[in-house]
Amino acid sequence: MLTKAKLLRMSAKKYMAKKQLEFFTTQLTEQKSEALGEIEDARQRLRVPPECKDEADRASFEMESQLYLRIVDRKSKLVKKIDFALRRIKTGEYGYCMETGEPIGIERLLIRPTAEFCADIKYINDDKEKHFAE
């Protein structure tokens, strides 16, 4: 089995070769399974409201409900990104910047396996987004 350490030591010539793609497919599949489990857990908690006998109980339940709704939303978005990354693996586009076509880099993919852009382009896009928000 390919480890993170071995992955980092591989030569640039082997970038996104079969073993690396298998490694990231496994990582992404595990992340997806975990996220789906968290979504299901949050939905279960939302389905079974506790008996709220007073205002404090109702307020507490409302706060918890908002938290679980945010979890469902955030994890659902992650699942979509994971599915997109898995499709990119199948098409041979995974690991390459969607804007420049340059390698994203193993280090960045280990931190964020769903990365779609190299660090430079991501920084530029984030900076543009920040300026539009101001």
Regions inferred by a protein language model and the residue ranges of each:
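Short cysteine-rich clusters marking metal-coordination/redox-active sites
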Residues: C97-G101, C118
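Amphipathic alpha-helical recognition patches that constitute DNA-binding helices
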Residues: F23, E99, P113
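Short functional micro-motifs and their immediate structural scaffolds
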Residues: I104-G105, D126
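Short Cys/His-rich "knuckle" micro-motifs
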Residues: E107-I111
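Interaction interfaces in information-processing and related assembly proteins
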Residues: M1-T91, H131-E134
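Short, well-ordered alpha-helical segments in soluble proteins
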Residues: K122-N125, E129
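Cysteine-rich micro-motifs
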Residues: A115-K122
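Residues immediately within or flanking Cys/His clusters that coordinate Zn2+
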Residues: S76, Y94, A115
